[in-house]
Amino acid sequence: MEILCMKTMKWIPWDNVLATGHARLDADHMILVDLFNQLATSIMERKGKVDCVNLLDKIVRHAKAHFEFEQQLMAEHRYPNTEQHTAEHVRLIAQAIKYIAKIEADSPGSHIPVIHFPEDWLTFHILAADRELADFLSTTDATAA
């Protein structure tokens, strides 16, 4: 999957590869993808640290709400991998907060790891963990939640 499309200033084009089949999860993921793309534009257009920090903060706030919803689903449906999935949520939020702190401190090269953040999120969370959760939920009639 091509993460950064320089011509369109998009890191992540939304397509069926990213869809889990769960309406609410997919809607939340679309918002995250849009926020990541806004962050890509901010970095590419060198809009500055305030803009990057504001966008990362929006990503964190949306992700926290999304993760709370996922954790509620996991509890309601007794998802067997809840502990591992929740640990991944904690790791992703901590990673984003670390990037915010580095950017605010004007650490040299602080924007570089941020560029790879969406790839990590996609590869290790949406495409793997969230898809596994959605597959589990589809067997418990929870797809429309």
Where are these regions (language model features)?
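Small-residue-biased structural context
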Residues: 2-145
